[in-house]
Amino acid sequence: MDYSNISYGKHVSLLNIISIVVFHADKVLIYHYLGAVPLAIYSIAFSLPAQLKVVSKMLTTLIFPKLSSSSLETIRATIYDKTLRIFLAYAAIIATYIVTAPLIFRWIFPQYLDAAPVSQALALGYLFHPTVLFSQTMFAQKRQKELYILKLFTNGSRILLLLLLLPPYGVWGAVYAFILGNALSSAASIILFRRLRI
């Protein structure tokens, strides 16, 4: 039995649990600061762009075996090109959604048309998701220290941004926090990846 793998798995599970809790913190804080109606608008606005997260999960499932079996040197040779190609695909999907969102809301959520602009803005936050390749490399290569730094920074910055932006900007503060949080997480992923040692 490989006890190092068991220990690593426990650490990853702990980090994932923390991330899940923080991911839902926006809804708790919106309800606390703004009330039930803004929470409903935000939740509905988030529901359609959030489907891109399913794409991200499928992507990580597909690439993980390759990242696990490849050397860091090999990954470095191709990761930036792959990230760019995935980014362009995401950009096309997001641009299409932004253009069609008003029509979609008139059809599916006619009573929540105010949520359409919020939803369009939230979709922009997913432009940063292709950098998941960098964090998945750290995961696949069992870089525990870097994963801890990334997760603690990402989760801490998300909470801080929500606390700073929600009171003055309302629902839009949550939108800004989501976009900025994703941008900071992506930047941290790239920086930590570049600092990995073979």
Task: Report the location of each language-model feature.
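Interhelical loop/hinge segments that connect adjacent transmembrane helices in multipass membrane
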Residues: 1-23, 62, 66-77, 196-198
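Interfacial transmembrane-helix starts/ends
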Residues: 6, 74-88, 96-100, 119
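Membrane-interface junctions at transmembrane-helix termini in multi-pass inner-membrane proteins
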Residues: 124-153
